[in-house]
UniProtKB/Swiss-Prot annotation:
Domain Piwi: 650-977
Deleted gene: phenotype: Mortal germline (Mrt) phenotype in which there is a progressive decline in fertility with each generation at 25 degrees Celsius, and after 2 to 3 generations the brood size is 25% that of wild-type counterparts. Fertility in these mutants may be restored when transferred to a 20 degrees Celsius environment. Progressive decline in fertility is probably due to defects in gametogenesis causing a failure to produce mature oocytes or sperm. Defective RNAi inheritance. Abolishes RNAi-mediated recruitment of nrde-2 to germline pre-messenger RNAs.
Positions with biased composition (Gly residues): 303-313
Name of the protein this chain belongs to: Argonaute protein hrde-1
Compositionally skewed regions (Basic and acidic residues) per UniProt: 18-33, 315-335, 343-364
Listed Gene3D superfamilies: 3.40.50.2300, paz domain, Ribonuclease H-like superfamily/Ribonuclease H
Organism in which the protein naturally occurs: Caenorhabditis elegans
PAZ domain mapped to chain residues: 376-481
Gene label: hrde-1
Length: 1032
């Protein structure tokens, strides 16, 4: 009998494991935790193109964090309903809560909104119970937004049902959440249900793309219904148990929390099967702390030696535009009227009776139990009084956070900025029973709330809603718990905690997933799943057979090197295959970190290292330029780089005390805006290169980067002949011509900004950050890389400006190799199946540029989506040992069929060597294959390309062009922040507005933002060094 995976994939397998029907029948009535997981064998490629070009070197048995789900008992049809929740305000206005008008941003509001919608639907069910055939609420699968699903036949109501809900329809503890949708206690809610068609679970129509995607969504919603309570924080498919203690606490204002992600997918061949992937997650959260303690901590970070990249030690350069700058204002509100109702009530849910994390405050938040000392507040007052970078850095840290007003029973506000003025020098006109008079903010709080401010000289916190600004004393605010720390706001301490000791080993990882299935998802004896006919077949992970791919062959100048299979890191003393040839080197010593005599000696040493590696430097080291500069003098740095570029200096070597100081990003910014190559070394690195102890490895690492930055190539990647005495392929020369000759590789990566980029007309400035696109492309030889970055406005998945930048890549190849590529392989960082159509649109835009490149030009495109953040994990079937290298799968492990993307070939590949924690493999989906290469060929080609990384001499997790594109996107993000610091963006925006006055209206905000972003992109990247791996 055919193996289960063969049935799912619709292909045969040469290594079938028989399905044991008798055992399955015996286990039928056993709980899922007692049943064995089905054993899967890996079938061959579903692409019917050619035979396998590469032989199987070795295999290993693996397990994945995927679990089989039986859906054959689901009703034939699931009825879909459109749900409209309309807020009926006491002032007569009606607003549809699902249209985004009320959709406040932020994690706290997302949590509150989800619970409010859930309680509303539960109450609607109770009121319309007869029209739901008297069925329990378990027959409702609600996405807590605009869509409801029911098994066919359950609903017996009309084509439209309306229910009006008021405060009297909810228990007090539920109304507390429901009222937060409108933030007014006397509003009512009109809920409108409209049948909106069916979703099919069986037959051919069930396999149509739109139906298949929605059926997958139903399975996701049904299996997540038990998470709709206040015990869990949900963000997309990530869930974090609220009551669990934090995993760790990196500092006084942050904590690392453990959670999980769950993703469901249908099997490709139907058959009533689906798969659920469950993975662990960790995420940093802000602690429940006072705003003064938070700000004091950020002040300490700023003073603590610069903070390094990612911290707040460096000025983030954002303007504080939009803050209140006057001495008085008649229209400002100091009462926090936009906050929510407070209280310490309890409310019911699936478990009934737990306390809401956002409304129950600890004693430490009271005036008698402050979590900061008077000296902390005094130091903060002094720092703000000195101006400088304090306000800008703390404002950037606070901006966008939800904070609670302790004087308003925990009402929430969102921080927009920090005002220039404080509670003593900010006044407004107040009306009361004594008439109208001018009062300061400090006086107002004493009169209105009987609160005498202890620190009235701290700046006021501004919260903006629409065009109205409210001001709040800092000492009356607390950071609301349950908010994740965004990547761009993580301090170095938090970043270290996320990547170091918190990484779980595979053995522990597998156990954690089992705990999640049992304790959190509770998929056994689940009434929601029973109502929809969904059954978890086993809580044991599926077993598969993976291939171990051979490493690439590495060619240096004098020898060809074959890395060890599964342990591919390699070292060699051979010379670079293409050493750079340069004219002159310039040395800059920052902040007197080394003596001038030592700098001169370093020039001699560096000259020797260049000669040893075959790098030609025309000018003698005694003729190199050496300068001493202050690292904070950006003007002097800029002028020197311009002068040296005119003097034909090829590369600037900057020496600083720290490994990644502020000046590092300044150098990289001017590198792309001026066009002079740079490399930054720390004092310790220079000492190692000058001395003997431990210096060899340091010298090798530096020279590998140095050669690339100067235009050389360290080694070439080739298709191997044999590994471990076994032939890899029948003819590697034939495959070389097929897969590498006249083939260009291009990688695309997007780094999104903090929010969607639009033009905010009310403040006359950009709102949010642009996205940064990193692009890397290969030249004549596939390991010779060039690249660039550019900005685009919208925080969306689709690449923009391809008509300009795709031809740029191809023309660079032609200029270098004197011919156009006949095949172009594109590696595109991607998300899930739902985004494939947008990538296809990108492909069509690329095709439309062919004639622009050259009339009649028609190369074959191969487009591969790389999902680095895929939740799929691969472990050895038998995990043993204590080290990460023992417990993880080795480099080159490849699972050919991963069952999740309907109609596309895909594979999971782990290229990197795991050194810590659990390896995260990358999932690849072959979206376009004009060249008709087999999946066997593309699997091996992808692994070979990972060896192209020219610095570490071992493969990273993705192919070299994609790894380079990722680094370029990061570089572009840093450059944007530096650009904000040194360029008056307000002046740029005003000039663009003047030139595009026709765009100044609400409907054209995106077009105006695009014009501003294009201007910045040209200014930042106009002198990018072409056809060179300058970012190494």
């Amino acid at each position: 009998m055919a193996d289960l995976l063969d049935k799912i994939m619709g292909s045969s397998s040469s290594n079938r494991i028989p399905k044991r029907d008798n055992r399955m029948n015996q286990d039928k009535d056993e709980p899922t935790s007692k049943r064995s997981a089905p054993m899967f064998s890996t079938p061959k490629s579903t692409t019917p193109i050619g035979r396998d070009s590469f032989a199987t070197m070795d295999t290993m048995n693996v397990q994945m964090n995927m679990f089989p789900v039986d859906i054959k008992d689901m009703p034939h049809k699931i009825q879909r309903f459109q749900v409209d929740v309309i807020v009926c305000s006491s002032n007569g206005k009606q607003i549809n809560a699902n249209l985004g008008v009320l959709a406040a941003k932020g994690d706290v509001n997302s949590h509150n909104r989800r619970l409010a919608q859930y309680y509303i639907m539960r109450t609607v069910h109770d009121k319309l119970l007869v029209k739901f055939s008297g069925k329990s609420h378990h027959f409702l699968a609600y996405d807590c937004a605009a869509t409801l699903y029911l098994p066919e036949g359950v609903y017996t109501g009309d084509d439209q049902e309306e229910v009006t809900l008021t405060i009297d329809d909810f228990p007090k503890e539920e109304w507390k959440f429901v009222s937060k949708l409108s933030r007014r206690k006397d509003d009512s809610y009109l809920v409108v249900l409209k049948p909106a068609g069916f979703v099919y679970t069986q037959g051919e129509v069930a396999q149509e793309e739109a139906n298949r995607m929605e059926l997958t969504r139903i399975i996701e919603i049904v299996t997540s219904q038990k998470l709709n309570n206040e015990d869990y924080l949900q963000f997309g498919n990530a869930t974090f148990p609220r009551l669990s203690p934090p995993h760790s606490e990196p500092d006084a204002i942050s904590e690392i929390r453990s959670g999980f992600a769950k993703v469901s997918r249908l099997s490709q061949n139907g058959g009533g099967k689906a798969f659920m992937t469950v993975d662990t997650k960790i995420s940093p959260f802000y602690k429940d702390t006072s705003v003064i303690k938070f700000s004091s901590n950020k002040l300490s970070e700023m003073k603590g030696g610069g903070g390094g990249r990612g911290g707040y030690g460096r000025s983030d350069s954002r303007d504080s535009r939009g803050g209140y700058r006057g001495g008085r204002s008649d229209s400002r509100d100091f009462r926090g009227v936009y906050g929510n109702r407070g209280g310490n009530d309890r409310y019911r849910d699936e478990s009934r009776g737990r306390r809401d994390m956002y409304d129950s405050r600890r004693d430490s938040g009271s005036s008698n139990g402050a979590d900061y000392s008077p000296s902390d507040a005094a130091e903060l007052e002094h720092a703000f009084g000195e101006r400088g970078n304090t306000k800008r850095c703390i404002e950037e840290a606070l901006k966008g956070l939800d904070v609670e007003c302790t004087h308003l029973k925990g009402n929430l506000i969102r921080v927009s900025s920090i005002a220039e003025n404080n509670a003593e020098n900010t006044s407004f006109m107040m009306k009361d029973d004594k008439g109208e008079r001018e009062v300061t903010v400090a006086e107002y709080f004493l009169l209105q709330y009987n609160i005498k401010l202890k620190y009235p000289r701290l700046p006021l916190v501004v919260s903006k809603r629409f065009k109205h600004e409210s001001f709040f004393p800092m000492e009356l605010l607390r950071i609301a718990p349950g908010q994740r720390i965004k990547v761009n706001k993580m301090s170095p301490t938090v970043q270290s905690a996320m990547t170091g000791r918190n990484a779980s080993m595979p053995q522990h990882h597998v156990k954690l997933v089992q705990d999640i299935l049992r304790d959190n998802l509770k998929l056994e004896q689940n009434k929601y799943m029973d109502a929809f006919g969904i059954k978890l077949m086993s809580t044991e992970p599926i077993q598969m057979t993976a291939k171990l791919l051979p490493p690439a062959q590495i060619k240096f100048k004098g020898q060809t090197y074959m890395p060890d299979m599964s342990r591919p890191a390699f070292r060699t003393q051979d010379k670079f295959v293409e050493p750079a040839r340069i004219r002159k080197i310039g040395i800059v010593v920052f902040d007197n970190c080394i003596q001038m005599r030592q700098a001169e000696d370093f020039c001699d040493k560096l000259s020797n290292f260049c000669r040893d590696n075959g790098i030609t430097v025309e000018k003698d080291s005694r003729d190199w330029s050496i300068r001493e500069l202050n690292s904070s003098d950006s003007v002097a740095i800029q002028n020197l780089m311009k002068k040296w570029l005119d003097d034909r200096v090829d590369i600037l070597v900057g020496i600083a005390r720290e490994k990644k100081p502020d000046v590092h990003d300044i150098l990289k910014y001017f590198e792309e805006s001026i066009g002079l190559q740079t490399i930054q070394l720390c004092q310790q690195t220079v000492d190692k290169m000058m001395g003997g102890q431990g210096g060899r490895q340091t010298i090798d690492n530096v020279m590998r980067k140095f050669n690339l930055k100067c235009g050389g190539t360290n080694f070439f990647v080739e298709i191997p002949n044999a590994v471990r005495g076994k032939a890899v392929c029948s003819n590697n020369e034939t495959l070389r011509k097929k897969l590498l000759e006249h083939v260009q590789f291009i990688g695309f990566e997007i780094s999104h900004g903090a929010s969607r980029t639009l033009f905010d007309r009310s403040r006359s400035q950009m709102d949010g950050e642009p996205s940064v696109v990193g692009v890397s492309y290969s030249l004549t030889n596939s390991t010779q890389l060039g690249g660039f970055t550019y900005l685009q406005t919208q925080k969306e998945y689709k690449l923009q400006k391809l008509d300009e930048f795709f031809p740029k890549c191809v023309r660079s190849y032609k200029e270098h190799s004197k011919t156009l590529p006949t095949r172009i392989v594109i590696y595109r960082v991607g998300a899930g199946e739902g985004n494939f159509n947008r990538v296809k649109e990108e492909v069509e835009e690329m095709r439309r540029t062919f004639d622009k490149i050259q009339p009649g030009y028609r190369p074959h495109l191969v487009v591969i989506i790389a999902q680095r953040a895929s939740h799929a994990r691969v472990f050895p079937s038998c995990i043993s040992g204590n080290r990460a290298t023992d417990q993880n799968i080795p480099s080159g492990t490849c699972v050919e069929n991963v069952l999740t993307s309907y109609g596309y070939d895909e594979f999971i590949l782990s290229s990197q060597t795991p050194l810590i924690g659990t390896v995260r493999p990358c999932k690849y989906t072959i979206l376009v294959n004009d060249a008709k290469w087999s999946k066997n060929e593309l699997m091996h080609l992808t692994y070979f390309r990972a060896f192209g990384h020219q610095v570490s001499y071992q493969p990273p997790s993705v192919p070299d062009v994609l790894y380079a594109a990722e680094n370029l996107a990061k570089r572009g993000r840093n450059n944007y922040k530096i650009h904000q610091r040194y360029v008056n963006l307000q002046a740029v925006e005003n000039r663009i507005i003047k030139d595009h006055s026709e765009l100044i209206n609400e409907d054209m905000r995106e077009e105006l933002a695009a014009a501003i972003v294009d201007e910045m992109s040209v200014a930042m990247n106009g002198m990018t060094i072409p056809k060179r791996n300058f970012w190494a």
